[in-house]
């Protein structure tokens, strides 16, 4: 809820709502990640702000700390244009059915690490509003987000 309201203000959009997801993260790595349900220490470097079927669907872009290929990136501007173009193409098309002519999603902006960290913090606020019993974890997580990429 908080993330969606912030995006509506940031992007000057009145007619969109949040997609209900806690947060979406695309992790760049030289290594394959074979399954979900694992924890990886990542550094957010940017965000691709998207509207998908009228819903805000931001994608945080992050790198694995210490990754041999991407680990030195600290901002989306550190990505080569070809890498960023491929990520954007994937995010715009991965939900499309074969033969579909109308795209489901549009990219409204591509922003750097500062905006990504702001969105992460807002998502954490959304979480704590939904699960107030986890307030202590929230406080330590905010401090961890503040220190990322330093």
Regions found by a protein language model. Name each.
Residues 1-150:
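Hydrophobic N-terminal alpha-helices or hydrophobic patches in metabolic proteins across all domains
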């Amino acid at each position: 809820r908080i993330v969606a309201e912030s995006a509506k203000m940031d992007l000057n959009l009145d007619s969109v709502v949040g997609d209900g997801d806690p947060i979406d993260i695309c992790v760049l790595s030289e290594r394959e990640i074979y399954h979900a349900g694992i924890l990886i220490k990542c550094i957010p470097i940017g965000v691709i702000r998207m509207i998908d079927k009228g819903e805000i669907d931001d994608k945080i872009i992050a790198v694995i700390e210490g990754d041999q290929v991407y680990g030195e990136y600290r901002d989306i501007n550190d990505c080569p244009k070809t890498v960023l173009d491929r990520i954007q193409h994937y995010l715009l098309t991965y939900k499309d059915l074969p033969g579909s002519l109308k795209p489901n999603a549009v990219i409204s902006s591509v922003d750097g690490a500062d905006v990504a960290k702001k969105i992460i913090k807002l998502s954490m606020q959304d979480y704590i509003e939904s699960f107030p019993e986890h307030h202590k974890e929230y406080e330590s997580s905010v401090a961890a987000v503040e220190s990322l990429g330093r």
